[in-house]
């Protein structure tokens, strides 16, 4: 049994980051950087890079591994993940704001779910290897106001938690002085839909955290010299 637990704390100074297009529009809707048609329709926002004030963040990384022998082969079980306690950034008032657990459509931070974890179970038996992975992302929320259309379709500001399962099988055999490894696998084998996010006029999803492609099956062959 192996257990690892790490606490980390980082204080960034003068972080170089890109401006938030949504933040520019919200703060100065008629600024030169905001491009509109003659009738006032928004068509684009010119953004640039700037030095942000201090950014403070801390959290915990954890990992648990356990292995044992069976009549079928060697089994490895694992749990790893990260929990972010805070991610403080400056806001327009010159104060700090903790943006953990938010989609962050209106600032330079990315979407920040509090917790992400991976469960694993691996069986090694001679030339055979079977691996199962479960990936969990905790829920978070968007602070963007919902339109009446979004509400009528059942959208809320909550972005649901997501759990997906990957499966992979490998078979390795000798050929002359080399080895050949055959692989068959699936990503998101349960075909779990990515949580929907109401983002501006689009009924979209968070590409930084979730995968909208659904179930993906693959095969592979590898020559090992």
Predicted regions and their residues:
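Membrane-spanning beta-strand positions in outer-membrane beta-barrel proteins
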Residues: 2, 6, 74-76, 129-131, ...
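Gram-negative outer-membrane beta-barrel transporters
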Residues: 8-146
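Residues that define the transmembrane beta-barrel architecture of outer-membrane proteins
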Residues: 56-60, 113-117, 161-165, 178, ...
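Residues on the lipid-exposed face of transmembrane beta-strands in outer-membrane beta-barrel proteins
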Residues: 62-66, 79, 119-123, 167-171, ...
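A cross-taxa feature marking solvent-exposed loop/turn segments within ectodomains of secreted
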Residues: 70-72, 160, 175-177
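C-terminal beta-signal and adjacent terminal beta-strands/loops
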Residues: 85-86, 134-147, 171-225
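Short, contiguous acidic/charged loop-to-helix segments that flank catalytic cores in large enzymes
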Residues: 104-110, 152-160, 208
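Generic long, charged, amphipathic alpha-helical segments
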Residues: 134, 143-168
